[in-house]
Amino acid sequence: ALGRCYIPNDRLSEIGLNHEDLHNPDSIDVFRPLYDSYLDLTCDHYDSAINYIRMIPRKYRSLRMACMLPVVIGLDTIALLRKGNVLDASERIKVNRSRIRKIAVSCLISTRFKGMENRILSRAANRALNGI
């Protein structure tokens, strides 16, 4: 929507596209594999964030919560990006407010229970990786 593109020209040319093609929503089928590879890389970085959260001592619940919340929201956003057409400017791709509230409550409660916290982080990572 802002007309910005952070995909390198050489990567686009490898799949027969240029920056102008990204203004056409119909280019999504050609663009999707490249885009998904960048989302996969993003998921790898989020895995590092999850590992960091798991290393925070359990007694620091507020810190764990402060780290978990943006990670789970980010992973949910990736899941939506995998399903949506990012080239269609009319299609808004964002986590809705009710989902944000649900994530916040889940993260808050889960910091008391290691198993629940691991489940929330693992499910969010799985959704992001598989687009579900």
How would you label these PLM feature ranges?
Residues A1-I132:
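Catalytic cores of Mg2+-dependent Asp-rich isoprenoid enzymes
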